[in-house]
Amino acid sequence: KEETGSDGNTGLCSSYLKYFMEDLADCFGAKGRHVLHASQCLSADVNAAFDPTFPDVMERNNCAYLNHGVCVTKFTGARGKSGTSDASAEFVGTVRQLLDKEQVVWQTGELGKVDGGGGGTVAAYIANLDVDTIDVGVPVLCMHAPFEVVAKIDVYMTYRAFFVFMAS
């Protein structure tokens, strides 16, 4: 539902995840809010890769590139500071250290220049539950076009990033 909005009782903005976590925690004698606060989330979402055909929509020094590994996106949003989700420096450090330790090739990237489009992800909705959350995913060339392009090494490194995160 992300591409059409995450609202309504079937979207991530609904209360179902919070209620589910509270019920699950209750089964083990814990409080849902404590479980959520102690949780960490890698929000699986793609990032825009630099497109040499349209270089003006990206900031070359702050964007993802194909064949440079999984993309870790500290913040998302559009229109300057609107609708953003911003991972804490501490959680970014935790993720970076884990990826480095496990030799996962990674890069950082933004979703485009300020006021040049950009976009949001569902990370903000998870982060609003008091869960440390960061976007991690594959850089994509021609995102949302009929023919999208990704690099095989980036897909593999994304798999590895999630694998080592879940194993830690």
Report residues per predicted region:
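Conserved active-site and cofactor/substrate-binding residues in soluble primary-metabolism enzymes
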Residues: G8-Y19, D86-T94, G117-G120, I153-R160
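Short C-terminal domain-edge/linker segments immediately following a structured domain
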Residues: D23-G29, C71-G77, V138-V140, V164-S168
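Active-site-adjacent substrate-binding region
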Residues: D51-F54, M58-A145
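His/Asp/Glu-rich mid-to-C-terminal helical/loop segments that flank catalytic regions of hydrolases
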Residues: V138-S168
